[in-house]
């Protein structure tokens, strides 16, 4: 997975796990500024929750939900880059570990190639 740049690091709280590579977060930007953002996991492509990949996609989503239940706190590292649907791209950290990397290691996603 290639490195993101420039990088910004924020504390965030999970409000929804959309699928295996997208979450909705309340991002603490500092100075009492909280933003709702949909974050697409940078550099990974999880299986889709619809169509032929549905079963694997639901497993990927559950993997993320188990690690990031609603209300869980995490760290999001992001840049100015947005994905094709306008979502910020980010790397999510739980207890210092990259969720993006965990998805790849556990076989719930592949390296994003597009």
Task: Label each PLM-derived region with a short phrase.
Residues 1-114:
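Small beta-barrel nucleic-acid-binding modules, primarily SNase/OB-fold domains
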């Amino acid at each position: 997975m290639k490195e993101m740049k420039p990088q910004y690091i924020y504390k965030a709280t999970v409000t929804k796990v959309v699928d295996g590579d997208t979450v909705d977060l309340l991002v603490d930007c500092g100075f009492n500024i909280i933003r709702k953002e949909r974050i697409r996991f940078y550099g990974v492509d999880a299986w889709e929750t619809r169509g032929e990949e549905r079963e694997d996609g639901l497993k990927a989503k559950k993997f993320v939900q188990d690690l990031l239940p609603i209300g869980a706190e995490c760290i999001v590292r992001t840049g100015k880059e947005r994905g094709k649907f306008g979502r910020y791209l980010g790397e999510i950290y739980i207890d210092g570990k990259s969720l993006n990397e965990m998805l790849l290691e556990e076989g719930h996603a592949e390296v994003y190639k597009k």
